[in-house]
């Protein structure tokens, strides 16, 4: 079926990965070795890392609730863009509601904090109000943050420039982050007839990825074919029922 999510694939993975960088590199190296049996003229190895996006969001001056929203919906491209538009316009903040909340807050301050209202103590309710009142966001700040995120997701360059481009971006936007080129599993721009590219927006297709992600597209008989993809999924096994967190990284070839 055309839209089926079930695909014929053969894969390999490292379960219980203890050396993240070496194991990430091993999976990519194994994928490249497997290409030796395929006939192709050229191609692209695209590498991304969703962990960098998470680190960026953690550094931005936006309310905690917005950080959670952006991280939760990073995988939903269209909805994520809608969130950025709301962030720019303060669409989630009604000034009238804020004023009413503040009045309720001041009224509750005069009451006994142990008094229960709808199953919660006034103390708990005050704590919630306090968080909302101290977590304001102006429209200008929302626009600035949205612009930073959009600019970040446009970064695309040869892999050997990845750290340089990211650090230039962080410095320009006064983000307290620095990335070393050794952070990436590969630094050669050309491997096995493949151009190696870094992309900040790549890796948003599957929600379970937690770090490095990659795909290999090859040109064969004038057609571009996605033959392999993979990445790190340190939370997937526990999401499927494991009692403990098991780090893992793997890849699969489409048959």
Q: Which functions belong to the PLM regions below?
A:
Residues 30, 45-51, 79-86, 232-236, ...:
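Low-complexity, flexible helical/coil segments
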Residues 61-93, 218-220:
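Acidic, His- and aromatic-enriched active-site or binding-groove loops in soluble protein domains
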Residues 38, 42-56, 66-70, 74-79:
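Extended alpha-helical scaffolds
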Residues 1-40, 90-255:
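Positively charged, Gly/Ser-enriched RNA/tRNA-binding surfaces
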Residues 46-59, 202-211:
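Beta-rich nucleic-acid/ligand-interaction surfaces
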């Amino acid at each position: 079926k055309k839209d089926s999510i079930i695909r014929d694939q053969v894969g390999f993975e490292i379960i219980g990965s203890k050396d993240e960088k070496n194991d990430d590199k091993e999976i990519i190296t194994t994928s490249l070795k497997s290409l030796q049996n395929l006939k192709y003229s050229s191609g692209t190895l695209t590498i991304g890392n969703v962990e960098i996006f998470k680190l960026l969001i953690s550094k931005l001056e936006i309310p905690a609730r917005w950080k959670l929203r952006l991280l939760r919906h990073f995988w939903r491209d269209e909805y994520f863009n809608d969130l950025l538009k709301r962030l720019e316009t303060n669409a989630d903040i009604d000034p009238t509601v804020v004023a009413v909340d503040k009045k309720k807050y001041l009224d509750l301050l005069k009451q006994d904090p142990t008094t229960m209202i709808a199953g919660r103590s006034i103390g708990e309710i005050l704590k919630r109000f306090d968080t909302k009142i101290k977590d304001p966001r102006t429209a200008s700040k929302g626009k600035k943050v949205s612009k930073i995120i959009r600019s970040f997701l446009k970064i695309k360059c040869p892999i050997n420039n990845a750290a340089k481009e990211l650090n230039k971006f962080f410095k320009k936007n006064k983000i307290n982050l620095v990335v070393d080129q050794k952070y990436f599993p590969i630094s050669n721009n050309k491997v096995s007839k493949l151009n190696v590219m870094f992309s900040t927006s790549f890796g948003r297709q599957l929600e379970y990825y937690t770090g490095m992600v990659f795909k290999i597209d090859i040109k064969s008989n004038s057609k571009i074919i996605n033959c392999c993809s993979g990445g790190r999924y340190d939370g997937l096994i526990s999401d499927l029922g494991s009692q403990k967190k098991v780090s893992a990284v793997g890849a699969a070839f489409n048959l």
